[in-house]
Structure formats: structure tokens, C-alpha cells
UniProtKB/Swiss-Prot annotation:
Organism this protein belongs to: Homo sapiens
One Pfam family named in its UniProt record: NEMP
Name this polypeptide is given: Nuclear envelope integral membrane protein 1
Gene name linked to the record: NEMP1
Keywords: Erythrocyte maturation, Glycoprotein, Membrane, Nucleus, Phosphoprotein, Signal, Transmembrane, Transmembrane helix
Chief place of localization: nucleus
Residues bearing PTM Phosphoserine: S368, S424, S425
TM region positions: 161-181, 186-206, 216-236, 245-265, 289-309
Subcellular location(s) of the protein: Nucleus inner membrane; Nucleus envelope
Keyword field contains Hydrolase: no
Length: 444
């Protein structure tokens, strides 16, 4: 190790102050070994660090320490951008992520915790280390397990479609949570998915119901829960390999457990209690907010979108309110425009359309069960004419149509104009005779 101290131990010659003979030499040897271990654990360690650059591949064949410095300030368009350090090797390697060079020096120093944690760390030949957009520096240590291992390290900054899909899923759960909680398709599909993914957790939960209280078996059950979660994580990481090698067993498991989950969901049925539906709705909306926050890499933009979503969901149509308010303000600032008057032709057409519509509504009401036929017939003078009207005949007789044409038709309009002109001429003649009569009166 770099910076370590090698201690050479020579046999003792003759008796010393720490003892005599063989016993004294053993004591001195033990103290020297312990002091050497102490110096090895506390000595300053010089770490050879390779600085990584984006999109530049660094290839190594030995254990090495790497650091990446993020100098770019995140912008609003980086909400779905992810920075990752990819380590791809020909054989299994162990990757340890730390914050800075000081932590790398601590990894090089001997400690009981580092010794045991090295056995617990997962060994992979292709791994990704996520780097935060606001993280200034990220360091990692790559340790090879076998000789002749070749690996490459590269920093990737790219648009991550997974983040975008997680954000869309959060939007859907938040705005459609009330609809999904009442949907039978969502109920059965969610039940089957939970049954397939968490079958071990469900089995452990069922077994815990049959265990007596204050039993030491609960310790085993807690360990079973942790082991089940670890197995689920391991299966998802190696899902492609499992499908390629054991697709028959995986397909049989999915079909069997899926059918059993569907049977259990069918037995209990969808939620019917309104309070249970509300609880499921709130749970889905809370999950949607969490997905929305985790799907955006910039925290303050994520919080702003969550606040907008809450306002849009809880306030009744705030955009429509804002539009109506702006419209009223603009109308108040402008001068009122007088309404446009209808022409004679438009007035006639509108009257015919509205009359025809009102007559059709009257026929529908008379044919409906709400209309009392006997009471209606007893109040009208011509029941047969009313019956013909209800069956689709005209509401006017030919005589009434001719009278209407004479009064309001084209000929009647001309006659009215002539009468108006005659009346106006008579008024003018009477006005012209009035001054002469007045003058004669004064003369007499």
C-alpha cells in the first residue's frame, strides 16, 4: 500500500529490560508488530487520483481511484438530465463511491469497518454511479478481484427517459387518482402486480398472523422481510439474464401467482366503502407527488410544479377564473359597444326557427307520460285539432294561414305603407289650413 510502513523485526540478542530469554524476545516482537499496525493505520496516505472528464474513456488494468468535478450550473432544461459514471469491466470489480479525496484516503487506511464492508459490497462487471447535478465532486475507488482485469470508466451526461416516465406516472396518479381508485381494471391489475412482485412478503405477512404474540419467531420474520426485499432487488437487477436462461420457470411463476392473485382480488371484490375509496385516492395522489418530485432533478422546480399541481387540483378551475377576471377587466376598460339590431329578414327567420322549435317541444311534452291527456282535452275547445297537432299536423288551419298572409304578407305591408302615407298627407293639409283660419279670426 502507498504510504504504508514496513517493519523489520530482528531476533533479540541476550536479555533485555523487557524480559529475559525467549519470553522477553516474544514480548518485544509483539509490541513491535502492534506498533507497526498502529503506524500503518494512522500514517498519511498519498492517493493517486485520476480526474475524469465528460465523454472521455479512461481504461485501466489495476485498482485505481477516480474523481469527477462538476463545474456546470444546472439550468431549467436540465430537469430530466442525469450524470452517471459508468464502470465496465471484463471481470467482476468492486466499486466504492465517496464524497472527496479525504474519504479516499480513509479507504486506504486500515479499519475494522472497511475490512468487513468490503465483503458486503456487491461485485459487478457493469455498474453505474449516479452523480447529483448540484454535487461539486464525486470520487470512487475501483478494486479488481482477479488479475488481468481490464475496465473502463466514463462520465455520461444525458437526457434520462426514465426520469421523464416517472414524472408522467406521478402526474397520472395525482390527477387521475380518484378515477383509478374506482376502476375495476386498476384494482385487478394492481392486485396481480403486487402478488407477482411481493409474493414472498405476502407469505411472510400471512404467517405472522398465525404466530403467537411475544414469540421469538418474529425475529425470524423480520429477517425474512429483509431477505425478501433483497431478493426482489436482486431479481430486478438480473431480470434480463433470468429471462434468457430460465424463461420457462419465470413464465410459469408469473401465470400461477398472477392467477392466484386474481382469484383473491375477485373473492373480495373492488372497494365499495366511500372512506376506503378516499383513502386509496389520497394514497395514489401522495405517491404521485413523490414520483413527480423524484422525476425532476432540480428540487426548486420540482417543488414549484408540485405547488401548481396542488392549486390546479384543489382550486376549482383557477385558470378559468383568471381568464374570466381578465376578460371583465378588459371589458370594463373598453367603451360599451351597442348591440347590433336584427334586420327584417333575420327577424323573420329567427321567429320561424324559434316557433318551430317551441312547437316540437310542445309535441314531445304532450306525448310524454308527464302530460295528463284527459285534463288537457277537457280544457281545450277542439280536441280533434289538438290530436292532429300532436300526431304531426300543422297547428294552423288554411283559413288562419290566409288571414295571416293578408295581414302580415307582402300585400299587407304595401297596404300599410299606403295608409301611412295617406294619414301623413292629411296631417300636412290640416296643418297648412290652421294658420289661415287663425289669421281670419284675428281679422274679424
Amino acid at each position: 500500500m502507498a504510504g504504508g510502513m514496513k517493519v523489520a523485526v530482528s531476533p533479540a540478542v541476550g536479555p533485555g529490560p523487557w524480559g529475559s530469554g525467549v519470553g522477553g524476545g516474544g514480548t518485544v516482537r509483539l509490541l513491535l508488530i502492534l506498533s507497526g499496525c498502529l503506524v500503518y493505520g494512522t500514517a498519511e496516505t498519498d492517493v493517486n487520483v485520476v480526474m475524469l472528464q465528460e465523454s472521455q474513456v479512461c481504461e485501466k488494468r489495476a485498482s485505481q481511484q477516480f474523481c469527477y468535478t462538476n463545474v456546470l450550473i444546472p439550468k431549467w432544461h436540465d430537469i430530466w438530465t442525469r450524470i452517471q459514471i459508468r464502470v465496465n469491466s471484463s471481470r467482476l470489480v468492486r466499486v466504492t463511491q465517496v464524497e472527496n479525496e479525504e474519504k479516499l484516503k480513509e479507504l486506504e487506511q486500515f479499519s475494522i469497518w472497511n475490512f468487513f464492508s468490503s465483503f458486503l459490497k456487491e461485485k459487478l462487471n457493469d455498474t453505474y454511479v449516479n452523480v447529483g447535478l448540484y454535487s461539486t465532486k464525486t470520487c470512487l475507488k475501483v478494486e479488481i478481484i482477479e488479475k488481468d482485469t481490464k475496465y473502463s470508466v466514463i462520465v455520461i451526461r444525458r437526457f434520462d427517459p426514465k426520469l421523464f416516465l416517472v414524472f408522467l406516472l406521478g402526474l397520472m396518479l395525482f390527477f387521475c387518482g380518484d378515477l383509478l381508485s374506482r376502476s375495476q381494471i386498476f384494482y385487478y391489475s394492481t392486485g396481480m402486480t403486487v402478488g407477482i412482485v411481493a409474493s414472498l412478503l405476502i407469505i411472510i405477512f400471512i404467517l405472522s398472523k398465525f404466530m403467537p404474540k411475544k414469540s421469538p419467531i418474529y425475529v425470524i420474520l423480520v429477517g425474512g422481510w429483509s431477505f425478501s426485499l433483497y431478493l426482489i432487488q436482486l431479481v430486478f437487477k438480473n431480470l434480463q439474464e433470468i429471462w434468457r436462461c430460465y424463461w420457462q420457470y419465470l413464465l410459469s411463476y408469473v401465470l400461477t401467482v398472477g392467477f392466484m392473485s386474481f382469484a383473491v382480488c375477485y373473492k373480495y371484490g373492488p372497494l365499495e366503502n366511500e372512506r376506503s375509496i378516499n383513502l386509496l385516492t389520497w394514497t395514489l395522489q401522495l405517491m404521485g407527488l413523490c414520483f413527480m418530485y423524484s422525476g425532476i432533478q432540480i428540487p426548486h422546480i420540482a417543488l414549484a410544479i408540485i405547488i401548481i399541481a396542488l392549486c390546479t387540483k384543489n382550486l376549482e378551475h383557477p385558470i378559468q377564473w383568471l381568464y374570466i377576471t381578465c376578460r371583465k377587466v378588459c371589458k370594463g376598460a373598453e367603451k360599451p359597444v351597442p348591440p347590433r339590431l336584427l334586420t327584417e329578414e333575420e327577424y323573420r327567420i329567427q321567429g320561424e326557427v324559434e316557433t318551430r322549435k317551441a312547437l316540437e317541444e310542445l309535441r314531445e311534452f304532450c306525448n310524454s307520460p308527464d302530460c295528463s291527456a284527459w285534463k288537457t282535452v277537457s280544457r281545450i275547445q277542439s280536441p280533434k285539432r289538438f290530436a292532429d297537432f300532436v300526431e304531426g299536423s300543422s297547428h294552423l288551419t288554411p283559413n288562419e294561414v290566409s288571414v295571416h298572409e293578408q295581414e302580415y304578407g307582402l300585400g299587407s305591408i304595401i297596404a300599410q305603407d299606403e295608409i301611412y302615407e295617406e294619414a301623413s298627407s292629411e296631417e300636412e293639409d290640416s296643418y297648412s289650413r290652421c294658420p289661415a283660419i287663425t289669421q281670419n279670426n284675428f281679422l274679424t
